[in-house]
Amino acid sequence: MSLTLSLIMPREQALLAAALAPYLAEVAPRASIDPARCAGQMLNRKDVTAFWIRNGTQRIGFAIVLNLPDDRRELSEFCILPQHRRRGWGQEAARTLLREFPGRWRMGLSKSSADAVAFWGTCLSAMPGIRDLRQGAPFTEHQIKSYSFEIAGAHDD
């Protein structure tokens, strides 16, 4: 069964907060971030698109995309829930999400999650259609580095 993305609706704020709590503890353990408040902010911003990552009807993770000016995007948050990791679904979900929105992307990587740093290094280097992959400085004090890249669209050469 292949993975799909579905929009996270504002009425699902409590579900997103429940998924965010362990994720935030993993990626920003020293930050005091209220998952419920964070979920509310994410779901009510006009420049954010939030997705469930699904395997069939089961929610196995989420992705939060910040829509930036000039048709650029930032992968703000990306999580495959721990019980669903190490099955290839993270790479499949990343490919699905990025193919859905070709163009310029950026993302920061948490300094508290060595697994995420390793995952994204491998995932992006093997991503079909990726161009101009660059490693850069972190965006926040909670990050170790960032990536910027472009994903080719269906009609790009």
Protein language model features and the residues they cover:
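Conserved beta-strand in the GNAT
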Residues: 52, 58-67, 74, 79
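Conserved acetyl-CoA-binding loop-helix of GNAT-fold acetyltransferases
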Residues: 80, 86-99
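Short hydrophobic/aromatic beta-strand or adjacent loop that forms the aromatic wall/cage
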Residues: 48, 142-150
